[in-house]
């Protein structure tokens, strides 16, 4: 089963359905349809860290909030972060995923913070010293596994 071939927009799998490679505009359009993503980085000792965060899209910047800790340390150091968002329907064997690479920075401008707060980015966990992080999209790619015909049968029940 081959899933990714550069410069090909469709890749056939052994299940008879094609995986669609998504262009930049489609990837950016899908991001705000989700509210949870995963931010990832590699620690100095070589371990991969991947943590869920709630986020909003502000133009082409992914914005999330955090408190003191590893995520904020890597932002301060200017390291490249990855960010993944997906929506999957296991019962239908369909879904999409978007992967972003970029650098992040703390958002400190009161005007930017006010605008972000209007986008309703509320933390799920209480943060003592909440910091907004903006991840600039340097590279973005995505794939979609569409629902394939004949897979699902719907049965209506009479009232």
Which residues are covered by each model-predicted region?
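Charged, gly/pro-rich active-site loop segments
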Residues: 2-19, 87-159
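Short beta-strand segments
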Residues: 34-67
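Short beta-turn/strand-loop junction motif enriched in small, turn-promoting residues
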Residues: 36, 44, 69, 88-90, ...
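Short, basic/aromatic recognition patches
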Residues: 11-38
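A short mixed-secondary-structure module that forms the rim of ligand-binding clefts
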Residues: 54-90
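Short glycine/proline-enriched turns and hinge-like loops at secondary-structure junctions
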Residues: 48-50, 75-76, 93-97
């Amino acid at each position: 089963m081959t899933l990714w071939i550069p410069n090909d927009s469709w890749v056939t799998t052994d299940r008879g359905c094609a995986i669609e490679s998504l262009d930049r505009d489609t990837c950016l359009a899908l991001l705000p349809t989700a509210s949870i993503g995963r931010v990832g980085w590699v620690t100095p000792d070589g371990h991969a860290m991947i943590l869920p965060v709630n986020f909003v899209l502000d133009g082409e910047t992914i914005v999330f909030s955090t408190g003191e800790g590893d995520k904020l340390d890597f932002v301060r150091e200017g390291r490249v972060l990855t960010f993944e968002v997906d929506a999957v329907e296991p019962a239908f064997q369909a879904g999409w995923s978007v992967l972003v690479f970029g650098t992040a920075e703390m958002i400190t401008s009161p005007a930017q913070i006010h605008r972000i707060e209007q986008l309703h980015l509320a933390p799920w966990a209480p943060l003592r010293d909440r910091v907004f992080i903006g991840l600039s999209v340097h590279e973005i790619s995505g794939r979609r596994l569409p629902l394939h015909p004949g897979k699902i049968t719907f049965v209506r029940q009479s009232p």
